[in-house]
From Swiss-Prot:
It comes from the Bacteria. Belongs to the LolB family. NCBIfam families: lolB. It comes from Shewanella loihica (strain ATCC BAA-1088 / PV-4). One of its GO terms (cellular component) is cell outer membrane. SUPFAM superfamilies: Prokaryotic lipoproteins and lipoprotein localization factors. This is Outer-membrane lipoprotein LolB. GO terms for biological process: lipoprotein localization to outer membrane; protein transport. Keywords: Cell outer membrane, Chaperone, Lipoprotein, Membrane, Palmitate, Protein transport, Signal, Transport. Plays a critical role in the incorporation of lipoproteins in the outer membrane after they are released by the LolA protein. Monomer. The lineage of its organism: Bacteria, Pseudomonadati, Pseudomonadota, Gammaproteobacteria, Alteromonadales.
Amino acid sequence: MNNLNYFTKISASCAALALMTLAGCASHKPIDYAPTQVESANQAEAWELQGKLAVRTPEDKFSTNLYWFHTQTNDDLTLTTMLGTTVMTLNKTPSQASLQIEDKVYQDSDAEELLRRLTGWSIPVDTLPLWITGQVSAQDEVVAVDEQGRPKEVLNHTGSSPWHVSFNSWQEQSGAELPRLLQLERDDIRLKLQVSQWQALTPKRASQPESTDDKQ
């Protein structure tokens, strides 16, 4: 399993069955978090994203819906067909990454390496949350900024070859400005991420215990 043909076949077969299985698709709602507004995206303690991801290599191309739930320690990514059937799920913690494809689960300590090993392509899941929220990392070289001083072109020097990141357009979501369209290129792979919805989240407080007086 080393190219996108595998996922294209999964997507096609899932689409054929989607009318029967869509009702059984799992909800992605993070029940322990509540929506909130922020002045800047970096203020969000957690967030959820819905959008579209397109992957292109010299051998193939693949387009999918993307759901991403991000906290300060964990990431949950789900790729689905246009009808909502899950193709692949990636769960990442500080110590382990788990990738589920159909009924098989694969694990590795490195999420990007796990994706590369199983699919032949990878997503920079460690740094992408920063780029999604319009920020840059310590390994990033800001090559160009726009008229508002926001990053426009960035080179990320993590790994053997750099990621070239283009912030093509911006939008306002949850009270904050963040990119609407990102393009990432490294060697012969190109990723395009379109952010349709981005919601800042805050942890829900534990409910107060019911007082004795209220029961009388």
